[in-house]
Amino acid sequence: MKNSQEDPIFIVDDDQGILESFDAMLGDDYHLIMIDNGTEAIERIDLKSPSLLFLDIKIPGPNGLEVLANLREKGIDTQVVVVTALAQDQYQKTAEKYGVYKYLHKPLDVDEIQEIARTVVN
């Protein structure tokens, strides 16, 4: 059963394959909004805060950490899961400073992604 359109999960990643993976993992059970750049992510979140945000760091426009900082500066407390191929500790420390729910490294684990969605959204 899908969650209501009032409570979307946003997936922000510029890799079409990753977006398709999220659709395969969560699309049957949740309303997903796929976004491929930081500018659109900020604009869409300003209009409607998601119930959960999966956010890549390396995206066009403002990067994922800049998107995260923007949300927190506006007082938006959406649960954010950073999903990245970057291994540098500095990125994780910055993300943790902004209170991310989880910091995950690609490749993605289906069970972990589904459990996060169940825990945060339901």
What is the predicted role of each segment?
Residues 48-54, 59:
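Active-site beta3 strand of CheY-like receiver
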Residues 17, 90, 108-117:
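C-terminal output helix
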Residues 66, 87-102, 115:
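Alpha4 helix (beta4-alpha4-beta5 surface) of REC/receiver domains from two-component response regulators
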Residues 37-40, 63-66:
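Acidic catalytic/metal-coordinating carboxylates
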Residues 19, 34, 60, 88:
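The feature encodes the CheY-like receiver
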Residues 16-33, 98:
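Two-component/phosphorelay signaling modules centered on CheY-like receiver
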Residues 1-10, 111-122:
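Non-catalytic signal-transmission and effector/linker regions of two-component phosphorelay proteins
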